[in-house]
């Protein structure tokens, strides 16, 4: 086992002893994030500082707003507005990568937001079709997956896993 893999397993095991998640304060909201991999822990720890403009935009929602989180990953930017605004807004989270979709739903559950966020394991695309999802890092919290074709320029590395996927338009 590589040292990096061993460290990952050790950190995840330590968090499992503490319930399997970390609670992060984000602009006055206490949000639980499942720790199934070092990547999800990193996403949790950088949550409130990585995309301040996104959080500013989410803060601007008003009652009756409808939010589509396309490429929701593990759900950080679905959880925050759902927690802040509750049933005053509608949140729809779309995440095609199976590891992330599992983590997204786990985070929805940990935060008691099952009535506030509807999640869908589909790729939002320019057309509705069956195709493949090319995944460069098949880990919870992984990103840069590409639907329909392997795009090395955007993925940065070749796919380590290819997953069957249905793509949908939101028209």
Put a short name on every predicted segment:
Residues 123-126, 169:
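Conserved acidic residues
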Residues 128-130, 164-167:
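Conserved sequence/structural motifs within the catalytic ATP-binding
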Residues 40, 140-141:
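Short, acidic Gly/Pro/Ser/Thr-rich loop/turn segments
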Residues 130-138:
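Polar, low-complexity loop segments and adjacent catalytic/binding residues used for recognizing
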């Amino acid at each position: 086992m590589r040292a990096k893999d061993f460290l990952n397993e050790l950190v995840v095991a330590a968090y499992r002893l503490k319930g399997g998640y970390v609670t992060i304060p984000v602009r006055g909201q206490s949000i639980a994030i499942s720790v199934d991999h070092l990547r999800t822990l990193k996403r949790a720890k950088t949550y409130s500082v990585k995309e301040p403009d996104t959080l500013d935009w989410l803060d601007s929602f008003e009652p009756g707003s409808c939010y589509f989180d396309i490429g929701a990953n593990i759900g950080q930017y679905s959880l925050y507005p759902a927690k802040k605004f509750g049933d005053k807004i509608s949140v729809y989270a779309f995440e095609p990568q199976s590891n992330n979709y599992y983590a997204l739903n786990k985070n929805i559950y940990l935060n008691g937001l099952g009535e506030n966020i509807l999640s869908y394991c589909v790729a939002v695309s320019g057309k509705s079709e069956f195709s493949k999802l090319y995944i460069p890092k098949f880990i919870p919290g992984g990103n840069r997956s590409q639907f329909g074709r392997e795009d090395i320029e955007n993925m940065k590395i070749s796919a380590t896993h290819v997953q069957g996927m249905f793509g949908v338009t939101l028209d």
